[in-house]
From Swiss-Prot:
Protein name: Glucose-6-phosphate isomerase
Catalytic activity: alpha-D-glucose 6-phosphate = beta-D-fructose 6-phosphate
Organism: Agaricus bisporus
Entry function: In the cytoplasm, catalyzes the conversion of glucose-6-phosphate to fructose-6-phosphate, the second step in glycolysis, and the reverse reaction during gluconeogenesis.
Gene Ontology MF terms in the entry: carbohydrate derivative binding; glucose-6-phosphate isomerase activity; monosaccharide binding
Gene: gpi1
Subcellular location, record wording: Cytoplasm, Cytosol
Protein's GO biological process: gluconeogenesis; glucose 6-phosphate metabolic process; glycolytic process
Gene3D superfamilies for this protein: 1.10.1390.10, Glucose-6-phosphate isomerase like protein, domain 1 (3.40.50.10490)
Length: 551
């Protein structure tokens, strides 16, 4: 990973020349009309080579590209040494240069196919076995609370990757869940979050999972302490904490001081980034909800995508293709966002999850060499499940002044084929219709023909869709653990490839730190009666205008 400015690559300059010269000719209506085989040329199918069978179809024929442009994009990836960077990641080299760390979420789901040398890698299987034994004891009813009752509620207390991943996966895999085991997730430091969650809990039957690598994360530990205080209000004896609290951490002394048994502490390592941690002990809540066998299928699905990414030529490599298309939209067409639009209600947290996954990874303006970039890096990630989004923000995507690339995704088969699959057929008809409408739009001539000669000019103009809005479509058979694992790994690797091309470090998150440091300074001053010192005039006075409670 060179850290070079992408704009210095010869292929980048060639792509800029193509964009400047040929942009007006890149019209999807014309491209489809000129080539009846465009779909077959600009689509790719992924078939897992190991683990549970997974097939994913990627249709990128509705992107603003031609085959020559695609080849230039792949040249760019090769010039940026993406394949070399990929191999370094998989081998355990310290590609997180700012923190001098390996980046080894792939090791958490490695089933002896990759040779990885890094401290802690050999311990992964032991932690997975610990997770299996614990989750099965809770799910079977063998694990009892302090009054001898079984557990029927789990509360995961974490923030960032310790929350977003488990929330997304447990929602996505709800059809595989233990329905009599309720799962809640508390992340926000706002006391409302923990207070409202505790109202749903029975202290005799609730298990709290405290997810913090250092066991010092302010939001997580504050919430955990409040949960412990609530619990002890009923249980009275601190010894009972050990039956109702477990920790996902590496800080043994802090965990045991809290009252959690060391035997109920699940380890992970500093080469696991928070936004890639659902594959680790952070996934304990997932294993509890869907069962360890299904958690393992999730891992195997991701591992098979890892194999695809590591061994498949770029031209047929789904993460590489999606990364290249994103760079073309982002850096040449000037698109600033990417909408993730799953036509599956179970995936309603998918965009939220990859907001962190993408924006925390590639929201950087400095290369690994210390240069300020002169191009756009990571896009803004957002989205919602279809068809909900159609009735809120699709208006702007279709007729707004911004280019918003979109990734549509849908299962061919529903888990809930109610009304003889009527719901699913309607859902899929919208899934197929939206990319077509975005690509081809509706001309003024077509509108006039539809409305007739008596239609007002204002009405005619308002019904014109310019089209030429880029999108990808991802289809898979049915959303199951292995398929979800493959989808997550697909996007992880796409993000990685883009970071390599842009020359940035996708694996630190320094932008999270400054606000946290200032907040700690202000918090210390809020406990005093005098002015908040050392900050700008609005910060100095707002706490007093808001009458901050010092009690």
């Amino acid at each position: 990973m060179t850290g070079s400015l992408a704009s210095n690559y010869a292929s980048w300059k060639q792509l800029q020349e193509i964009y400047d010269k040929d942009r007006a000719k890149i019209v999807l209506r014309d491209l489809f009309a000129a080539d009846p085989q465009r779909f077959s040329k600009l689509s790719a199918t992924y078939n897992s080579q190991s683990g549970p069978g997974v097939q994913i179809l990627l249709d990128y024929s509705k992107h603003l590209v031609t085959e020559p442009i695609l080849q230039k994009l792949f040249n760019l990836l090769r010039e940026a040494k993406v394949e070399d960077a990929r191999d370094k990641m998989f081998s355990g080299e310290h590609i997180n240069t700012s923190e001098d760390r390996a980046v080894l979420h792939v090791a958490l789901r490695n089933f002896n196919d990759f040779s990885i040398k890094e401290e802690g890698v050999d311990e992964v299987s032991k932690v997975l076995q610990h997770m299996k034994e614990f989750s099965e004891s809770v799910r079977s009813g063998q694990w009892k609370g302090y009054t001898g009752k079984t557990i029927n509620t789990i509360v995961n207390i974490g923030i960032g990757g310790s929350d977003l991943g488990p929330v997304m996966v447990t929602e996505a895999l709800k059809p595989f869940s233990k329905r009599d085991l309720n799962a809640h997730f508390v992340s926000n430091i706002d006391g409302t979050h923990i207070a409202e969650t505790l109202r749903l809990c029975d202290p005799e039957r609730t298990l709290f999972i405290v997810a913090s690598k250092t066991f010092t994360t302010q939001e997580t530990i504050t919430n955990a302490e409040s949960a412990r205080d609530w619990f002890l209000g009923f249980a009275k004896d601190k010894a009972h904490v050990a039956k109702h609290f477990v920790a996902l951490s590496t800080n043994t002394s802090a965990v045991t001081a809290f009252g959690i048994s060391e035997a109920n502490m699940f380890q992970f390592w500093d080469w696991v980034g928070g936004r890639y941690s659902l594959w680790s002990a952070i996934g304990l809540s997932i294993a509890l909800v869907i069962g360890f066998d299904n958690f393992e299928k999730l891992l195997r699905g991701a591992h098979a995508m890892d194999q695809h990414f590591k061994t498949t030529p770029l031209e047929k490599n789904l993460p590489a293709i999606m990364a290249a298309l994103g760079i073309w939209c982002n850096d040449f067409y000037g698109a600033q966002t990417l909408a993730l639009l799953p036509y599956d209600q179970y995936l309603h947290k998918f965009a939220d999850y990859f907001q962190q996954g993408d924006m925390e990874s590639n929201g950087k303006f400095i290369t690994k060499n210390g240069d300020r970039v002169n191009y756009q890096t990571g896009p803004i990630i957002w989205g919602a499940s279809g068809t909900n989004g159609q009735h809120s923000f699709y208006q702007l995507i279709h007729q707004g002044t911004k280019i918003i690339p979109a990734d549509f995704m849908a299962p061919a088969t529903s888990h809930n084929p109610i009304a003889n699959s009527k719901h699913h057929r309607i859902l899929l008809s919208n899934f197929f219709a939206q990319p077509e409408a975005l690509a081809f739009g509706k001309t003024e001539e077509e509108v006039r023909k539809e409305l007739g000669q008596n239609a007002s000019e204002a009405l005619v103009k308002s019904k014109v869709f310019e089209g030429n809005r880029p999108s990808s479509s991802l289809m898979f058979d049915k959303l199951d653990p292995a398929t979800l694992g493959a989808l997550i790994a697909l996007y992880e690797h796409k993000i990685f490839v883009q970071g390599v091309v842009w020359g940035i470090n996708s694996f630190d998150q320094m932008g999270v730190e400054l606000g946290k440091v200032l907040a700690k300074q202000i918090l210390a001053q809020l406990d005093k009666s005098d002015d908040v010192k050392g900050h700008d005039s609005s910060v100095r006075h707002l706490p007093f205008i808001l009458q901050v409670d010092h009690c």
